[in-house]
């Protein structure tokens, strides 16, 4: 269960970074 939670946390961080990258791209262009 701990491993699954860690995987979920990693996915959440990746999604957040992807969102920040998209927001920055929209703001720049």
From Swiss-Prot:
The membrane topology of this protein is: Single-pass membrane protein
Which phenotype arises from disrupting this gene? SclA and SclB double mutants show arrhythmic cardiac contractions and correspondingly, cardiac cells show irregular action potentials (APs), involving 'double' and occasionally failed APs. Calcium transients in these mutants show higher amplitudes and steeper decay than those in wild type flies.
Where does the entry say this protein is expressed, by tissue? Strongly expressed in embryonic and larval somatic muscles and postembryonic heart.
Q: What is this protein called?
A: Sarcolamban B
Q: What does this protein do?
A: Plays an essential role in the regulation of calcium transport at the sarcoplasmic reticulum (SR), which is secondarily required for regular muscle contraction.
Self-association and partners: Interacts with SERCA.
Top-level taxon in the UniProt lineage: Eukaryota
- Where does it mainly reside? membrane
Any one annotated GO CC term: sarcoplasmic reticulum membrane
Q: Which keywords fit this entry according to its UniProt record? A: Membrane, Sarcoplasmic reticulum, Transmembrane, Transmembrane helix
Q: Which residues cross the membrane?
A: 7-27
Source organism per entry reads Drosophila melanogaster (Fruit fly)
Miscellaneous note, as given in the UniProt record, is:
This protein is produced by a bicistronic gene which also produces the SclA protein from a non-overlapping reading frame.
Per UniProt, subcellular location reads as: Sarcoplasmic reticulum membrane
Which example biological process does GO assign this protein?
Answer: regulation of cardiac muscle contraction
The record's section on InterPro entries has: SclA/B (IPR054083)
